[in-house]
């Protein structure tokens, strides 16, 4: 009898041990997967908010292998002085062959990336962030931190657009969220004239240079600084003042469908003065 009772006790305990994990996992199973979170749930949580911000940062290029180098090999690969054997294509140099053979397309500016498409994706993500991010006191997301986040995103949007301007010239400048349910006429925005884009980015960089810090501690290194704003602004204004974009008659026929010219045909020497002042501001 005692042996039977002991055996029954052991069986009962084993069943209990087997069932406990099932009940303890109920809360876990009730949780919504990260990839199924609503946008409200994201911005109600400080950690998810930071993850969204990190996603906006995601298009910032590697300075060695991407932005400073064309196709990872240097802008000089587009020059007439550079030649290569077709047999080198098997070693990953195929992109350079595309350049030399005239089969290079705007979507191949950066290998493995579609800069045009990805820029608009990140800009939209940034605009959503600016609209949704908020203070969460019980999660230590303060008003001050929210403002810092917003300024970082504003910089990133301006920075991404400055890259677009450098690579493509005029493009549709979108500064507010567009509703996907809008009509095709609204969504198919025409390209914005070059000088209009420059003026917008000029104002953004200048304003942010007065807000963003000059440096960060090691924990936050890599975030945008006032110096970065001034440097990008000076570089952009220098190109805008150059003969390439300042009254270049070669672009006189580059217009939108409604006839709006995308490049000014009037040479303006004041652009050089503005560029010089901007460069001096960086040095000082």
Specify the residue positions occupied by each region the protein language model found.
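Short coil/turn linking the two alpha-helices of tandem helical-hairpin repeats
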Residues: 165-166, 172, 239-248
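Amphipathic alpha-helical protein-interaction segments enriched in hydrophobic
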Residues: 222-232, 236
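Conserved, well-structured interaction surfaces
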Residues: 45, 50, 58-68, 88-168, ...
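Membrane-proximal, proline-rich intrinsically disordered regions
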Residues: 26-77, 254-255
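Polar, glycine-rich mid-to-C-terminal structural blocks
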Residues: 239-241, 270-284
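A solvent-exposed, charged loop/short amphipathic helix patch at secondary-structure junctions
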Residues: 247-267
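Bacterial Sec-dependent N-terminal signal peptides
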Residues: 1-34
